[in-house]
């Protein structure tokens, strides 16, 4: 577990040291630009949906179908996807495709990490490598969303809500770190099947309730 956390930490160190070098031959610089490329689609889609309105997406039937449907897609990707590529093998096009997949996470129930891992597996990434890139890609995406919400609360003068939001971010960060440990430990020898089963069960339950069964 510690090794997994240190691996991600080392990758981030490399990014911070060499991000300003526009050179895909440098590992740290390449990873930085891959993350940037993978983040841009979600930022654009998020701003577009925000201006259009997202309330209609919060329907329990939509959530149920996305949880169930993307659980099946993850199962297919994990079964059919090759397991030979690592983060260092990713190209700008790969990062863009993963970033486009991440846009689907704007639909409630999709799971940001789940959909990015799914695309990574379709692109032939090793399970642990797909999970690592999904986690690295989450940093700017979640940070941008948090800053946007914080700015909106600040401009409305709702400082109490800002405190609540900060508490939520803190707890979310703690549980995210815990999730990293658990996922990396599990993926050493296992597949995504338990996560697929969880999504199938939860999605089915929500749909049955939504349709009155």
Region roles according to the model:
Residues 1-8:
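Short, small-residue-biased leader/transition segments that mark boundaries at the very start
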Residues 50-58, 151-163:
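Membrane-interface helix termini and inter-helical loops of multi-pass transporters
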Residues 71, 87-103:
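Small-residue-enriched transmembrane helix starts and helix-helix packing motifs
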Residues 98-101, 114-137:
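Interfacial segments of multi-pass membrane proteins
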Residues 128-152, 163-171:
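A small-residue-rich subset of transmembrane alpha-helices
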Residues 176-201:
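Interfacial loop-to-transmembrane junctions
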Residues 207-213:
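Juxtamembrane boundary at the C-terminal end of a transmembrane helix
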């Amino acid at each position: 577990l510690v090794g997994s956390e240190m691996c991600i930490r080392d990758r981030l160190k490399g990014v911070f040291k060499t991000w300003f070098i526009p050179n895909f031959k440098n590992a740290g610089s390449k990873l930085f630009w891959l993350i940037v490329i993978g983040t841009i689609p979600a930022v654009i889609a998020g701003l577009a949906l925000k201006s259009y309105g997202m309330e209609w997406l919060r329907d329990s039937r939509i959530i149920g179908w996305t949880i169930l449907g993307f659980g099946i897609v993850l199962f297919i990707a994990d079964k059919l996807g090759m397991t030979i590529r690592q983060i260092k093998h990713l190209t700008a096009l790969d990062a863009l495709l993963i970033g486009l997949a991440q846009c689907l996470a704007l639909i409630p129930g999709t799971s940001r990490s789940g959909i990015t891992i799914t695309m990574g597996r379709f692109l032939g990434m090793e399970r642990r490598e797909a999970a690592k890139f999904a986690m690295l890609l989450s940093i700017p995406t979640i940070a941008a969303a948090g800053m946007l919400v914080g700015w909106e609360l600040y401009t409305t003068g709702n400082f109490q809500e800002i405190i609540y939001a900060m508490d939520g971010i803190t707890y979310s960060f703690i549980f995210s770190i815990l999730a990293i440990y658990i996922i990396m430990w599990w993926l050493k020898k296992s597949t995504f099947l338990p996560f697929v089963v969880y999504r199938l069960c939860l999605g089915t339950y929500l749909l049955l309730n939504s349709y009155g069964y």
